[in-house]
Amino acid sequence: MNRRISIVAVVLIVAGVFTVRGVFSQAPPQAARKVIKLAGGPISAPFSDAILAGNTLYLAGRIGIDPKTGKVPEKIEDEIKLLLDGEKEVLAQAGMTMDDLVYVQIACTDLSLFQKFNPIYASYFSTKDYPAREFIGAGSLLAGGHFELQAIAVRK
């Protein structure tokens, strides 16, 4: 009787080990991935405007270029609005809004522009629960831009 119990115990342990190995050795299923690329952008480069992976949207760096001229406007306020309007457009293609942003990084060529940037930035949100954010200094940016924004959003 004890021998039979010992054999059953060994069989159960071996079966358990193989089951656990099988469960933990399988890679998790990959989240569906959708590329978001705005049509008619002024710069043709080898990157997407954003990648939607599951409920998370990874937004590429964006500068405030006028899509009609392909240039950064002279007025700083106009550049900021173009930058944020572009972010809104990318978010909308993923079925999201600015309020879905969870992390924002802004690179700026002149940190004295921080005070001009903030009120315009804040006006693009319908809530005061702003995303985590950093505002960092940068040497120079493409097309003579003063700001470059990259972000992560999570669908609510």
Regions found by a protein language model. Give the residues of each.
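N-terminal presequence-like segments and the immediate start of the first folded domain
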Residues: R4-D85, E89-V102, A107-K156
